[in-house]
């Protein structure tokens, strides 16, 4: 059946298609060849082309640092720089990519509501709002640490959830995550892919995210848009995620398509998200609108995408108040993720909280953080050498690689699945009488050689 897509007519969001089409022109606020640097693009999200050159002199780097980083990074233009470049800790935040995965759990109550409701379209409203909610945290411009192979992150004491993530592959960097409470199970395999463009970088979310709602066994599949990080070296760094997010109910065929508007002149369209919940016949049933850094609302609509008479917009999600003037723009939940308040009893020694480089950066000691980061990277190379000399192969503890290779808009993905061993481990740990202070545990993700010293 052909899609009755209101974007093609005069519906409530008739301008969406042209906004996406004009993405290229909206992003033309740039200066190419600035100061003799060929291919340099600087974009001021709050201005126009007239002040792009002025914008180039802003940002976190001094002029000599900008020049040095530009010369160093030029050779990588067009490349995937996910793990091939050693970067200074000054651009890092005290968090790893595994912890970043856990930030998706902040508003997990929306998945609880999706499981509880009997309305199939409200189910999609709640679930897609959960998927949107993390973008407020994702706008941070600091780089998280790449996890060490075998590194983990555990989280408890939040909405009844047990969360576990593990770095399952080093080249290419791949992470797997699982979270569960009485209402839902979340499973994710992530293999980020990047393209360095000089003063910006495209981040492609190669991955598979599935949520199972336990009451009816409904399975939801999520495909997010790419993310673009602007002004990496010249100008103030900022993040945009233009494009569409699609969440599909694999059980019923219902779906949500939400459009992230690209940032236009003087910030127009920035943060805006609009779209519809469709039934399996691709007929719009609910319109959704809002800003991913503020709130989302919904309203029942007709077949043309227009609001039904007698209905009104209702807010479904609102961003929680964040700390003022936080150095890393952390939310209260991000601080909670970094703390031991969310750590379970008998925390795994491979947990991200225990990384000495991450902790040193959190304490404000960049020199020590840089030293510890280099030390961990050296030990990781030593373990790899030891493993290869012995003819041994790394195997994740809490996830198993399957034979499934799933296509994504940005490339194929090898799928890892939760093997259930962590649930057994956690039950045993919770029944243990061990009262060891987890903060005193030494970080040790190594499997093949005692490299913790």
From Swiss-Prot:
Gene3D superfamilies referenced in this protein's UniProt entry, alphabetically: 2.40.160.120, 3.30.70.3490
Organism: Arabidopsis thaliana (Mouse-ear cress)
InterPro entries, sorted: OSBP_sf, Oxysterol-bd, Oxysterol-bd_CS
Gene Ontology CC terms, in alphabetical order: endoplasmic reticulum; Golgi apparatus; plasma membrane
Phenotype caused by lack of the gene: Unfertilized ovules, but normal pollen tube attraction.
Region (Required for oxysterol binding): 166-175
Protein family according to the UniProt entry: Belongs to the OSBP family.
Chain spans, region Required for binding to PVA12 and location in the ER: 398-403
Tissue note: Expressed in roots, leaves, stems, flowers and pollen.
UniProtKB keywords: Endoplasmic reticulum, Fertilization, Golgi apparatus, Lipid transport, Lipid-binding, Steroid-binding, Transport
Pfam families reported for this sequence: Oxysterol_BP
UniProt GO molecular function: sterol binding
The protein, known as: Oxysterol-binding protein-related protein 3A
Main location: endoplasmic reticulum
Biased composition (Basic and acidic residues): 370-392
Disulfide bond annotation, renumbered to this chain: none
Lineage top rank: taxon: Eukaryota
């Amino acid at each position: 059946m052909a899609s009755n897509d209101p974007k093609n007519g005069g519906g409530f969001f008739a301008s969406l298609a042209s906004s996406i089409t004009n993405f290229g022109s909206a992003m033309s606020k740039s200066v190419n060849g600035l100061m003799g640097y060929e291919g340099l693009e600087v974009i001021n999200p709050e201005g126009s082309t007239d002040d792009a050159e002025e914008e180039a002199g802003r940002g976190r780097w001094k002029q000599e640092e900008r020049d040095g980083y530009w010369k160093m990074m030029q050779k990588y233009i067009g490349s995937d720089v996910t793990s091939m470049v050693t970067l200074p800790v000054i651009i890092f935040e005290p968090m790893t990519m595994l912890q970043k995965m856990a930030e998706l759990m902040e508003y997990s109550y929306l998945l609880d509501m999706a499981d509880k409701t009997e309305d199939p379209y409200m189910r999609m409203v709640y679930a897609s709002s959960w998927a949107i909610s993390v973008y407020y945290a994702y706008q941070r411009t600091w780089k998280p640490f790449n996890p060490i192979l075998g590194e983990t992150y555990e989280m408890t004491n939040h909405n009844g959830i047990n969360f576990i993530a593990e770095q399952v592959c080093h080249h290419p960097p791949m992470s797997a995550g699982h979270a569960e409470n009485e209402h839902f199970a979340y499973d994710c395999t992530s293999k980020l892919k990047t393209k360095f463009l000089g003063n910006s970088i495209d981040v492609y979310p190669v991955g598979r995210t599935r949520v199972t709602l336990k009451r009816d066994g409904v399975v939801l599949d999520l495909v997010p848009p790419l993310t673009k990080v602007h002004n990496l070296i010249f100008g103030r760094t900022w993040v945009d995620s233009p494009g569409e997010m699609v969440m599909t109910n694999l059980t019923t065929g219902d779906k949500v398509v939400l459009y992230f508007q690209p940032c236009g002149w003087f910030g127009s369209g920035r943060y805006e998200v609009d779209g519809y919940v469709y039934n399996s016949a691709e007929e719009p049933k609910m319109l959704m609108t809002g800003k991913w850094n503020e709130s989302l609302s919904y309203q029942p609509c007709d077949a043309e995408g227009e609001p039904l008479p007698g209905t009104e917009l209702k807010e479904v999600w609102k961003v929680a108040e964040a700390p003022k003037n936080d150095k890393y723009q952390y939310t209260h939940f991000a601080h909670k993720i970094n703390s031991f308040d969310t750590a379970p009893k008998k925390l795994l020694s491979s947990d991200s909280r225990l990384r000495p480089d991450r902790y040193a950066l959190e304490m404000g000691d960049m020199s020590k953080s840089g030293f510890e980061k280099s030390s961990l990277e050296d030990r990781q190379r030593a373990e790899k050498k030891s493993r290869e000399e012995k003819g041994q192969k790394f195997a994740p503890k809490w996830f198993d690689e399957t034979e499934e290779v799933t296509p994504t808009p940005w490339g194929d993905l090898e799928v890892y699945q939760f093997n259930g061993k962590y649930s057994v481990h956690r039950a045993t740990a919770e029944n243990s009488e061990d009262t060891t202070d987890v903060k005193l545990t030494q970080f040790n993700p190594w499997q093949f050689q005692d490299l913790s010293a």
